[in-house]
């Protein structure tokens, strides 16, 4: 038996706040074939219990740099040994978004930046990403770029890694 435990690099604990997002509603029904539990938000204790049951030592929670969820930030504040943050950045939002990234990382345990190209229908090779790439290098911050076919029924060509 191994004592190794996993790090889950993409955990969403506030799905209950996303019931209004059309592509997520369609993904719930068409892709995941899920019921109403799909849009369940978790408490800190529920999330830790689920992590322990699954053998997950640490979870990286996604938080938007513009209007970050206090709920998500509280997870990291309450249990910094179990939760870190991935700062969700919009490359189309310009320098103010990058300044928000710096501020968030200065105040909270941000371990990576994250972009989801289908949200903007821009491939990662688009010049609008370049300032983000530069900022991540300056901050010595890894960048997670979502690639492959998206689960939600949205355009996915921009996430084709080939």
Which role fits each region the language model picked out?
Residues 1-62:
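An N-terminally biased module of ancient metal coordination in phosphate/nucleic-acid-related enzymes
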Residues 162:
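Histidine- and aromatic-rich ligand-binding microenvironments
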Residues 57-58, 66-159:
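Active-site gating/metal-coordination segments in enzymes
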């Amino acid at each position: 038996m191994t004592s190794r435990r996993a790090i889950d690099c993409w955990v969403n604990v506030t799905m209950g706040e996303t019931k209004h997002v059309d592509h997520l509603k369609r993904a719930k029904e068409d892709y995941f074939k899920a019921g109403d539990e799909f849009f369940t938000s978790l408490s800190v204790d529920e999330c830790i219990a689920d992590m322990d049951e699954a053998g997950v030592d640490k979870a990286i929670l996604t938080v938007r740099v513009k209007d970050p969820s206090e709920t998500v930030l509280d997870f990291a504040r309450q249990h910094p040994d179990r939760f870190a943050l991935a700062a969700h950045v919009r490359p189309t939002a310009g320098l103010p978004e990058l300044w928000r990234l710096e501020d968030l990382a200065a105040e909270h345990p941000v371990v990576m930046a994250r972009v989801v190209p289908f949200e903007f229908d821009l491939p990662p090779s688009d010049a609008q990403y370049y300032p983000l790439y530069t900022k991540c290098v300056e901050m010595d911050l890894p960048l997670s770029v979502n690639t492959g076919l998206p689960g939600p029924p949205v355009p996915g060509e921009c996430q084709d890694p080939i």
